[in-house]
Structure formats: structure tokens, C-alpha cells
């Protein structure tokens, strides 16, 4: 699950924990919750029969020096009653006083916020700042440590500082949408940055080339799709409904744009579709950013794309481009990645969906029918395919690592992909009666 849509997962484990048999499954497999999600997902078990075990499990991890367990632990708060109550639950499970538990959390949490709270900006190593913190505190770094921060940003292009030391971004936990967030955080001082743009504003007057951090982050993204053998064409939703926030300040549009640019960048440079993508619009057209930076590509994504989610128009555009390029069957995309909130235009005509009709034209032109991956960025309940539909995948969340798992299998249907995704986890089967839960 990672940094994806958490609410559904938390609702499910809360529901299971309130069932006698479901609670046994939760207790037996508690360790998978922070592994698949985050440590604070355990708070979904507060108020259930699994609460005590969850707090003890979390407290032990903190006492054992687990940094992520400490990072996501609730802090005491005078203004937030719920947070204070959760802090007390956790520190009681640890058997510690409030003062000692706060010290333990501080000792185990080496995060940039600690230095900022002490006004010790000079101690911050910007090459180690996580991507989310880089976007969140960009302006604070400029305000309190502009000289060192600018030196680091300028050195990013060369990869070394004036003393010859390596300079890089922290890519340990980095997703394409983080690069989008960093880009617009870096432009916030202009007064026409992310917040206005994501709600339909335009920011064409901004010099995107100055966003060195976002470009460096994008270049540092891992290759999540190596070895899959897939040629992916992103079809990205840019409609008004994509402005919805899906996690904190991250919008569905951030996810769509980040994934689209990432996938188009991973296609081989000798392929005619390298660094090309299609945004949904009334008149879809292929956008190329082959010789440009990530930040310039974002500007291209932003310029002039509004309106409908017309899948058929996008499919026709890809086919026309393939014919214009003289692309062979080994060059044309074999996977169409539709990144959307699934709020499509009316999709039926003569009992055939827009996608089916569009793909029939590909076959008529002599090309092999591609696989279709629907990536639901907003968690809406639109389902463009049934679970047994061949050559179709339904996925959601934020991480492109999902693609490698999806594209690596031979049986390409929603149910087969689900089963493949969970088969590596050795689930502990508790000793419960063999009857349905609920």
C-alpha cells in the first residue's frame, strides 16, 4: 500500500478487528500492517479488541530503536485531544512516563524537523532531507538558511560541491508525485505556483528551469519497471475532477502527472514514443519532451489541456502517430496506462466500449492488441472492467513499483494480478473456526 490511499485499508482492518475471528487474523499478522503501510495505520485499531496488542507491538518497536516506528508515533498535544490520547496509549504500553517517552521518541527520530525546531538549520544535510520534507519546508530553508541551501541547489547540477564532495537528493523514499510537489513548492514565492495551478489556474509566466531540486529528484527515481519488457504509453487525466486531494496536499492530478512523465521517460530512447504522453482533452494530442527537463515537461503538461476524458480520441491519436512514425509491432506501445480518477465520458456505443472500439482499429491496422492498465488515482468506485477480463489490470495508489508486479505476470486479468501481488506474503493462519467472518 505504501503512500497510497489509506482510508480504505484502515476501514477494513478496523472492521476486521471488531469481529472475533477477524481480530484473531489481525493479531496473528500485526507485523504486516507497518510493512505494507505505515506505523500510524495501527491507530485504526484503537477502540477495538486488538488495540492493546497493537500498542504493545508499536511500543516494543520504538524501544528497540526502530526509527520509522518512532517517526509515526503520535506526539503529546495540548490542542489536539485525540493525538494526546493516542500518545498516552502508546507510552503506557511502553511502561514509561510522558517525559521519558518524549525523550525516547526524540532520540529515535532523526528528522529535519528536530533541527528546525531548535533553529539549527546549519546542521541540516540537504542531501539527506526526505522528498516530502523538501517540498514542505522549501520556503523555510530559503528564509533561515538561504546561503547554504542555494549552494546545495546549485551544486546539484554538477553532482559535487566546491570541495569535491558528492551532492545528491534523498531518493530513498521518492515517488514521481513528490517531484511535482517539490517543483511547485520551489515556485511558491512567485505567487502563481502550485495552489493556483492545481485548481485550474495557469502559471506559464514562471521560469520552471530554476527548479533544480525537482529535476534532480526526478533523475534520481529508481527504475521500477526494469525487466518487464513493456512499452508503456501513459494516457493521463487532466480533467477538473482530478484536483481532488488524495493524501495531505497531494492531488490526484499530481499522481497522474508524475506517473505519466515517469513512464514516458522509461521507454527506450530509440523508440519513437520515447518521452511522449497524451493528456485527456477534447482534442487529444501527443506531447513530446524528449530534449527537455522534467520541470519543462510539467509546464507542457499544464499548457492548454482542459476538458473531457475522451479515451477514444486518445487511442486514435496513438494509432495515427504510430502510422506516421512507421512504427513496427515491436515499437508501438504494448501497454496503455490510463491514469485517471475513473470519471470518464459516456463510454458505450453500439454495445462496445470506447476502449474496445479503439483497440479494434489497432488490430485492423496490423498491430498487436495492447494490454490496458487502469490506474485509479483518486480511490473512486468507478470500475471500467470486470475481475475476469483478460488483458486488463485495475490498480490504485501512488507507487510505480506496483507496475513491475502487474506487468511481470503471464495471466493478465484483475483477479490474477491481485493474487500475484499477495502470494509473496506468508500470512499466519490463526486457530479459528472455519466459517465466514462477519
Place the predicted regions along the sequence by residue.
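Long lumenal/extracellular ectodomains of secretory and single-pass membrane proteins
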Residues: 1-255, 265-438
Amino acid at each position: 500500500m505504501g503512500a497510497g490511499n489509506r482510508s480504505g485499508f484502515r476501514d477494513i482492518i478496523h472492521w476486521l478487528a471488531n469481529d472475533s475471528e477477524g481480530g484473531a487474523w489481525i493479531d496473528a499478522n500485526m507485523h504486516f500492517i507497518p510493512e505494507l503501510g505505515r506505523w500510524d495505520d495501527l491507530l485504526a485499531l484503537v477502540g477495538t479488541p486488538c488495540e492493546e496488542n497493537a500498542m504493545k507491538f508499536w511500543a516494543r518497536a520504538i524501544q528497540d530503536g526502530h526509527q520509522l516506528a518512532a517517526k509515526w508515533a503520535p506526539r503529546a498535544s495540548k490542542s489536539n485531544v485525540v493525538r494526546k490520547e493516542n500518545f498516552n496509549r502508546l507510552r503506557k504500553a511502553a511502561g514509561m512516563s510522558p517525559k521519558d517517552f518524549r525523550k525516547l521518541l526524540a532520540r529515535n527520530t532523526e528528522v529535519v524537523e528536530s533541527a528546525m525546531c531548535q533553529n539549527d538549520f546549519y546542521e541540516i544535510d540537504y542531501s539527506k532531507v526526505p522528498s516530502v520534507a523538501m517540498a514542505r519546508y522549501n520556503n523555510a530553508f530559503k528564509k533561515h538558511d538561504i546561503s547554504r541551501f542555494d549552494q546545495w541547489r546549485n551544486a546539484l547540477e554538477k553532482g559535487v560541491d566546491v570541495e569535491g564532495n558528492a551532492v545528491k537528493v534523498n531518493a530513498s523514499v521518492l515517488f514521481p508525485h513528490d517531484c511535482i510537489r517539490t517543483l511547485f513548492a520551489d515556485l511558491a514565492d512567485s505567487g502563481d505556483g502550485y495552489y493556483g495551478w492545481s485548481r485550474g489556474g495557469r502559471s506559464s509566466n514562471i521560469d520552471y528551469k530554476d527548479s533544480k531540486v525537482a529535476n534532480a529528484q526526478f533523475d534520481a527515481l529508481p527504475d521500477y519497471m526494469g525487466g518487464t519488457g513493456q512499452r508503456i504509453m501513459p494516457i493521463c487525466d487532466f480533467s477538473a475532477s482530478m484536483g481532488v486531494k488524495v493524501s495531505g496536499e497531494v492531488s490526484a492530478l499530481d499522481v497522474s502527472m508524475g506517473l505519466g512523465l515517469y513512464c514516458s521517460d522509461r521507454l527506450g530512447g530509440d523508440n519513437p514514443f520515447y518521452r511522449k504522453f497524451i493528456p485527456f482533452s477534447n482534442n487529444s494530442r501527443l506531447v513530446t519532451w524528449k530534449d527537455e527537463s522534467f520541470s519543462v515537461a510539467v509546464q507542457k503538461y499544464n499548457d492548454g489541456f482542459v476538458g473531457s476524458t475522451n479515451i477514444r480520441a486518445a487511442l486514435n491519436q496513438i494509432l495515427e502517430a504510430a502510422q506516421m512514425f512507421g512504427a513496427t509491432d515491436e515499437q508501438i506501445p504494448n501497454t496503455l496506462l490510463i491514469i485517471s480518477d475513473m470519471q470518464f465520458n459516456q463510454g458505450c456505443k453500439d454495445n462496445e466500449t470506447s476502449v474496445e472500439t479503439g483497440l479494434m482499429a489497432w488490430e485492423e491496422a496490423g498491430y498487436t492488441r495492447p494490454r490496458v492498465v487502469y490506474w485509479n488515482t483518486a480511490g473512486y468506485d468507478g470500475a471500467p472492467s470486470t475481475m475476469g477480463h483478460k488483458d486488463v489490470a485495475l490498480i490504485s495508489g501512488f507507487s510505480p513499483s506496483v507496475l513491475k508486479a502487474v506487468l511481470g505476470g503471464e495471466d493478465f486479468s484483475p483477479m490474477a494480478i491481485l493474487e500475484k501481488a499477495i502470494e509473496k506474503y506468508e500470512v499466519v493462519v490463526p486457530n479459528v473456526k472455519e466459517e465466514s467472518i462477519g
